[in-house]
Amino acid sequence: MSTSHPTGLEILEFTFPGSRPAGAIAPVLVGVVGSGNLEVLLEAAAGSDCSVRIETSARGFGPIWEAVLRDFHERHPLAGVRVSINDMGATPAVVSLRLDQAAAEVAS
């Protein structure tokens, strides 16, 4: 799902069914919002899904975001988590890196 935000950001939301409960975790923050980078916040949420909300300055890339997130979720089928992403034009490789870093923090 995609919506416009008054500041010109595009907001994308995705939900994936999870199979690996994250349990009671402290919020994890990785990355830095800046040119060509992004910030990922991963935190516990009610339910068994992995929900993702993206605020991005790079409009029109919903299908690419979905592909990157599906790939991440295949590697890390987390359940009961909410992922919030603030993006300033990061490449798919950087997005994957930051998501993997957040998942590694949860696993440790």
From Swiss-Prot:
Matches recorded under Pfam families: ACP
- Positions bearing O-(phosphoribosyl dephospho-coenzyme A)serine: S35
Q: Where in the cell is it found?
A: Cytoplasm
Keyword entries, A-Z: Cytoplasm, Phosphoprotein, Plasmid
Say if the entry is tagged with keyword Nucleotidyltransferase: no
The record describes its post-translational modification as:
Covalently binds the prosthetic group of malonate decarboxylase.
Instruction: List each coiled-coil range.
Output: none
User: Domain of life, per the record?
Assistant: Bacteria
What GO cellular-component annotations does this UniProt entry give? Answer: cytoplasm
User: What is its biological role?
Assistant: Subunit of malonate decarboxylase, it is an acyl carrier protein to which acetyl and malonyl thioester residues are bound via a 2'-(5''-phosphoribosyl)-3'-dephospho-CoA prosthetic group and turn over during the catalytic mechanism.
Protein name from the UniProt record = Malonate decarboxylase acyl carrier protein
From which organism does this entry originate? Burkholderia cepacia (Pseudomonas cepacia)
- The protein's gene is named mdcC
